[in-house]
Structure formats: structure tokens, C-alpha cells
From Swiss-Prot:
GO biological process, one term: protein quality control for misfolded or incompletely synthesized proteins
Species classification: Bacteria, Pseudomonadati, Pseudomonadota, Betaproteobacteria, Burkholderiales
The species this protein was found in: Acidovorax sp. (strain JS42)
Stated family: Belongs to the PTH family.
Protein name per Swiss-Prot or TrEMBL: Peptidyl-tRNA hydrolase
Cellular component, GO, one term: cytoplasm
Catalytic activity entry: an N-acyl-L-alpha-aminoacyl-tRNA + H2O = an N-acyl-L-amino acid + a tRNA + H(+)
UniProt site (Stabilizes the basic form of H active site to accept a proton): 93
Keyword annotations of the record: Cytoplasm, Hydrolase, RNA-binding, tRNA-binding
UniProt keyword annotation of Cell membrane present: no
Keyword Ribosomal protein: no
Length: 211
């Protein structure tokens, strides 16, 4: 089961509505769902909340170290409570996924994301879960920094928020450790199409009876 949910972002009102803070938005939504409040915890360099689910403690964390030092916060809490990497989920903004979509994966490279890069370094492994929240790509690599540190257009913000609400449907499965189900829930962005009713078979013509 996932015992530590982390959302990545930058602290401060000037960053609050920027694309790079999509992970913070996800944790805020999860905190509302679990009816807990994030409070400052200096020992873990972040805003922290604890929820009790089926007798187990579950932690929510928003590092307040700025993005590039996120691993300092994640590692401090994970080590204190002896939470292994495979029981950590990090929600973060993802350039390679369009707004309106999210993807769940375990392990892999940091793909240039500085928050993930520092978590890799501080945990000593990449073997943790990520919830990749699509923010789209500006199309030009040189524009990436400006892109992530700017507010999305209102229609894009709506799409990102929709993907956050959709992916939250998976949190009970994440808490239960049913990662296959959680992945299916996150990746299924549209309800399946109803099966098309087969046309009624033409009624067979009555056969002529033998004389």
C-alpha cells in the first residue's frame, strides 16, 4: 500500500497557480478527500498531514524546500517512519503528457524534472511510484522553464484540475496496494462505450411442409 503521498511544487503565493505546482494541487485535493489539514513540520521541511485508514497511518507531504531540494523533505519523513520507496507516491507535473491526462508508473528516469532528480539522489533509488499530471509542452525546449513557472490558461487549468479529480478515484486502490486497479482507474480517461446492440436477426421464412 502507499503510505506516503507527496506532491511537488514551489512554496509561496507567486508560485501557487503555476504549472510546476500541479503536484501541490493534487495533494490539496487528496487532503480534502481524506478530511485532513496540512500543517508545517520543520523536521520534515514541509507541510504534512496524517490520516488513519483501516488502522494504518498514511502521510501527505508538500515539501517547502523549493522544487530542486524536494528529496530532502521526502527522505526525512520516509526515513523517520521507515517507509520504503515502493510505498511512496510522488505526484508531479509532466511535460510529456497533455493537460487533461495523468499516468501512473513505478520507477524510471527523472527525465530532467529537478524535483524527481533530487528525490532519486536522496532516496538512493528511483524505485518509487509517480503520478504524472499532464501540463503539456511549450513545443520548444528553451521555453520549458518559463512554461512550468507560468500559470496555465483558464481552459488548460480546467483540464489539469479535471485530471486531478479523475486520478483521485484511484486513491482507495492505492491505499489498498492494488496498483493494477489504480493504474487502470488513472489511465481510463473516458467511460467505455456502450456495446452496440446487435440488430435483431431477420425472422426465418417458414419452411414449406411436406405434403
Amino acid at each position: 500500500m502507499i503510505k506516503l503521498f507527496v506532491g511537488l511544487g514551489n512554496p509561496g503565493p507567486e508560485y501557487e497557480a503555476t504549472r510546476h505546482n500541479a503536484g501541490f494541487w493534487w495533494i490539496d485535493a487528496l487532503a480534502r478527500e481524506l478530511k485532513v489539514t496540512l500543517v508545517p513540520e520543520r523536521s520534515y521541511h514541509g507541510l504534512v498531514a496524517r490520516a488513519s485508514v483501516a488502522g494504518h497511518s498514511v502521510w501527505l507531504l508538500q515539501p517547502q524546500t523549493f522544487m530542486n531540494l524536494s528529496g530532502k523533505s521526502v527522505a526525512a519523513l520516509a526515513r523517520f517512519f521507515k517507509i520504503p520507496p515502493e510505498e511512496i507516491l510522488v505526484a508531479h507535473d509532466e511535460l510529456d503528457i497533455p493537460p487533461g491526462q495523468a499516468k501512473l508508473k513505478r520507477g524510471g528516469s527523472h527525465a530532467g524534472h529537478n524535483g524527481l532528480r533530487d528525490i532519486h539522489a536522496q532516496l538512493g533509488t528511483s524505485d518509487y511510484w509517480r503520478l504524472r499530471i499532464g501540463i503539456g509542452h511549450p513545443g520548444v525546449k528553451a521555453e520549458v522553464v518559463n512554461w512550468v513557472l507560468k500559470k496555465p490558461a483558464p481552459d488548460q487549468r480546467t483540464l489539469i484540475e479535471d485530471s486531478i479529480l479523475h486520478s483521485l478515484k484511484a486513491y482507495p486502490a492505492l491505499l489498498a496496494g492494488d496498483m493494477d486497479k489504480a493504474t487502470l482507474l488513472v489511465h481510463t480517461t473516458k467511460p467505455p462505450r456502450p456495446k452496440t446492440a446487435r440488430p435483431a436477426q431477420a425472422q426465418a421464412a417458414p419452411q414449406a411442409g411436406a405434403d
